[in-house]
Amino acid sequence: MDKIAVLIPCYNEEKTVEKVVSDFKRELPEAVIYVYDNNSTDRTAEIAEKCGAVVRHEYVQGKGNVIRRMFREINAECYIITDGDDTYPAECARKMSEAVLERNVDMVVGDRLSSTYFKENKRAFHNTGNRLVRKSINLLFHNDIKDIMTGYRAFSYEFAKTFPILSEGFEIETEMSIHAVDKNKIVRAHV
C-alpha cells in the first residue's frame, strides 16, 4: 500500500502535465504519482511517463469514471487528487496529506474560491452556479465547505474505498462533497 498517492486524471493535458507531475514530485517526494489518461489525443500519457508518473488508462470517457477506477485500483493511506491542467498549487499538498495522515481527516477540500478564481473565470453564470450549489449544500447539511466543486482534494483510505461513485463526469466533485457531509465524514479546508 502506498503511503501517499497523487492521482491526476488527464484529458489532453500535454501542455501542463509535465509541470504538474514535477511540482508534486518536488513537494511530496515520497508519494507515488499516478496519471490516468482518459482518451487523450495528444502526448499526455507519453510526457507523464517520461516525468516518472505511473500512467494508466481509463477508456470510458468522464472524470467520474476515471476517479472510480483510481479508487478501485490504488491502495493508499492518503489520496490526493489534482487536475492535470495546473490549476492547483502543489505547495498545499503536504498540509493536505498531513491532515489525513496525522489528524484523521476523511476529506480535505482545496479552495479555489478564496483566491482570484472568481475574477479570472469569465464563463457566464459559472460563478453564480458555484455559489448557488455551495450555499444550498451547506444549508441542507449544516456545513461550511468553501468550494464544493474543486478538483483538488485529499482523502483517507476509508473514504476512497467506501465512496459509491455514481457520477460519470465533472459532477463527481459535488458528489464527493455531498457524500462527505451526508455520512458525517470529517471534512477540512486546506490552510
Where does each model-flagged region fall?
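Cell-envelope/extracellular polymer assembly enzymes that use nucleotide-activated donors
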Residues: K3-A5, V32, E175
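Short, well-formed alpha-helical segments that are part of the catalytic scaffolds
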Residues: N12-R26
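A conserved acidic beta->alpha catalytic loop
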Residues: D37-A45
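Acceptor/aglycone-binding surface of glycosyltransferases and processive sugar-polymer synthases
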Residues: Y59-E73, A90-F170
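Short aromatic/hydrophobic "clamp" motif used to bind/position activated sugar donors
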Residues: Y79
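The conserved acidic donor/metal-binding loop of glycosyltransferases
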Residues: D83-Y88
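A short, conserved alpha-helix in the catalytic core of glycosyltransferases
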Residues: F159-F163, G169-I186
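Conserved small/polar residues in nucleotide/adenosyl-binding loops
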Residues: A189-V191
